[in-house]
Amino acid sequence: LAANKKVAFMAKQELFTDKNGLLRFLVKNLGAFAVNREKPEIATFKTVLELLKTDWSLGIFPEGKTSQSHILENVQKGFTLIAKKAKADVVPIGIKGFDGYAGKSLFKKHITITIGKPISYELPPEEILKQWAEQICEYTGYENRIGQEQEVSQ
């Protein structure tokens, strides 16, 4: 795993106008770009594919939010399709201790970040999702409620 690559993060567009000044500052200054989750645009996917052709990596938060319930469900599965189209392996990253940050100082919290094992983009999308969810739940302690019945369209 090459750690010397720059990372651009896909972030929901609401974060760029968030009332939390620290969060807004971080999103704008740590290489994030806005994504409309309700109406994803083709230009977004073109940007992602161009980005991955360079020396950048892409950070995606498929959950779309922090979870107060510690349950992994309703995951945006498009990351599996992006991985396949870009021929880029998926590296799960679990963040534990970040939930409940709103209105509180992050400097008083213990946050653990675990970098997982790469998942081959050559696997079927459903298998990429399954392996990603298993690793994320292992690293975060979340309960996996992503069912086998969930389909990933190709």
Question: Where are the language model's segments positioned?
Answer:
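Catalytic core of membrane glycerolipid acyltransferases/transacylases, capturing the structured
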Residues: 1-39
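Non-catalytic C-terminal accessory region of glycerolipid acyltransferases
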Residues: 43-154
